[in-house]
Amino acid sequence: MMEEIDRFQDPAAASISDRDCDAREEKQRELARKGSLKNGSMGSPVNQQPKKNNVMARTRLVVPNKGYSSLDQSPDEKPLVALDTDSDDDFDMSRYSSSGYSSAEQINQDLNIQLLKDGYRLDEIPDDEDLDLIPPKSVNPTCMCCQATSSTACHIQ
């Protein structure tokens, strides 16, 4: 630790350390040059042109046909979604025919029947207005004036 402090204070020691750094940098540059010569590349990697053997052969490129035949399904593949079903019991469209507003009335009646089956009678029971008029409970049950005085009796003026 003391040697480092002395080196920074002594100009002769500082010049020696600068020479050491310069020598190290020069060694690194030489090693980099030798490595680039071994690889067959000269100069910076930015200026290098790509080699011809880096390009993929034309026979290996996959180009789709114009007819998009890849979209056709082979017989062994199954579709993701089956649209045709045999059962018509799920939803009966004949009840909801488009014959004017009578179909809307039919739907409304069906909804009312379903609500009654489920036990909801929201449209038949009127709202109780007394429920809306309940005052909120007070947070502090005592009077504010009682807390301010030290007496046990509370007097409101």
Swiss-Prot record:
Biased composition (Polar residues): 38-52
Swiss-Prot/TrEMBL keywords: Acetylation, Phosphoprotein
A matching Pfam family: FAM219A
List of residues that carry N-acetylmethionine: 1
Paired cysteines (S-S): none
Entry superkingdom: Eukaryota
Basic and acidic residues: bias regions: 17-33
InterPro entries per the UniProt record, alphabetical: FAM219
Modified residues (Phosphoserine): 44, 74, 87, 94
Residues carrying Phosphothreonine: 85
Bias (Low complexity): 94-103
Region (Disordered): 1-103
Sequence similarity: Belongs to the FAM219 family.
Protein name in the entry: Protein FAM219A
